[in-house]
């Protein structure tokens, strides 16, 4: 979306925020700094009550702990590697920018917000369901707001969570990332399917060598005698482009079909960028960013740092191994507990946030 759309969304968000702010006492909205808000609701509590009665979630949560630790370990290595490459100049600074700064330019507003809400809502709902299965009270749920824009959702657990066994806390903490990973995996076939949806493909950007013949707004009709009906058709064609080869392209312009013969560049490119119709683009972009946000939210939350889920998951791992009947595994758990405990994880927390914040600040310098 262009800058004008971003301005419209911002204006609408501010108007909504002014209305919410004026009635904040009656709707149980707590505000911070005049721009942030926490809106506590009962939204989702019935679903949590209904699904949380099944004890199967307890077993799934316990099994998820070692899986989440492994994924979190690789995420930690990736964060450190990215920071080193960022400082050495082998990674562009844009790669370290926070997601919020990418909205409007890289991430389309509407699909991006929908995808982010799906990721965070599923994440928090899973925490609530797993907590309920362990008999821990879910006090409330709610929405986090920045001006009038929803940043995400949350569930507020009872005080029993703080005093619960490490293993239980780890199982509940693993629920959110696990739910995000499931949505991530589910979105893969959906994304593949979305590329096959029948749609017109409009040229949104054109460069050499195609710019001599084609214009923005032209609709791709046919390439080398093959009708282009979907993004998948165009992607498959793009894979076959060879350097310095002639391609016959038919386009629709002003209700007329025009035919051009274009020779590809030395790099094997035609210089055409296309986009599907608005409704199809909205669907594809929503699935695409749902895919990415769930993947990133899952792995980021598994870092061994407070207040992320990974802190409780990692803290529970040695305890889980110690309780195994196998003497060797139990001994490994005892040894790991010397290195993975609340004290060492507190130090790792400082390291993780210093690396992340340092990388972000460096990328904006």
UniProtKB/Swiss-Prot annotation:
GO biological process, one term: membrane protein intracellular domain proteolysis
Protein's UniProt keywords contain Repeat: no
Record field: transmembrane: 3-23, 60-80, 100-120, 141-161, 171-191, 280-300
Protein location: Cell membrane
Membrane topology reported for the UniProt record: Multi-pass membrane protein
Primary location group: membrane
GO cellular component labels: cytoplasm; plasma membrane
Family: To S.solfataricus C04034.
Official protein name in the record: Uncharacterized protein MJ0971
Species of the source: Methanocaldococcus jannaschii (strain ATCC 43067 / DSM 2661 / JAL-1 / JCM 10045 / NBRC 100440) (Methanococcus jannaschii)
């Amino acid at each position: 979306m262009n800058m004008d759309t971003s301005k419209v969304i911002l204006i609408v968000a501010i108007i909504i925020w002014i209305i919410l702010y004026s009635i904040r006492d009656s709707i149980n909205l707590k505000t911070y700094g005049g721009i942030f808000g926490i809106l506590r609701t009962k939204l989702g509590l019935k679903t949590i009550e209904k699904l949380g009665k099944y004890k199967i979630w307890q077993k799934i949560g316990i099994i998820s702990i070692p899986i989440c630790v492994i994924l979190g370990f690789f995420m930690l290595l990736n964060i450190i590697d990215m920071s080193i490459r960022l400082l050495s100049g082998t990674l562009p600074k844009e790669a370290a920018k926070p997601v919020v700064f990418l909205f409007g330019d890289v991430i389309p507003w509407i699909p991006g917000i929908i995808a982010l809400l799906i990721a965070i809502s599923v994440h928090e709902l899973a925490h609530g369901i797993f907590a309920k299965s362990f008999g821990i009270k879910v006090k409330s749920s709610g929405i986090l707001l920045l001006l009038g824009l929803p940043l995400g959702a949350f569930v507020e657990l009872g005080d029993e969570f703080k005093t619960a066994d490490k293993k239980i806390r780890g199982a509940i903490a693993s629920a959110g990332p696990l739910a995000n990973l499931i949505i991530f995996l589910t979105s893969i076939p959906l994304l593949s399917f979305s590329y096959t949806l029948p749609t017109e493909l409009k040229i949104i950007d054109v460069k050499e060598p195609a710019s001599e013949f084609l214009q923005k707004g032209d609709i791709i009709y046919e390439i080398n005698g093959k009708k282009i009906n979907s993004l998948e058709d165009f992607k498959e064609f793009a894979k076959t482009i060879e350097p310095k080869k002639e391609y016959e392209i038919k386009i629709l312009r002003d209700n007329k079909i025009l035919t051009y013969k274009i020779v590809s560049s030395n790099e094997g490119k035609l210089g055409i960028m296309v986009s599907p119709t608005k409704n199809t683009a909205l669907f594809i972009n929503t699935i695409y960013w749902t895919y990415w946000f769930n993947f990133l939210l899952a792995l980021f939350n598994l870092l061994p740092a407070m207040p992320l889920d990974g802190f409780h998951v990692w803290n529970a791992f040695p305890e889980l191994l110690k309780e195994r009947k196998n003497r060797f595994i139990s001994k490994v758990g005892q040894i790991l507990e010397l290195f993975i405990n609340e004290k060492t994880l507190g130090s790792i927390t400082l390291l993780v946030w210093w690396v992340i914040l340092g990388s972000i600040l460096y990328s904006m310098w």
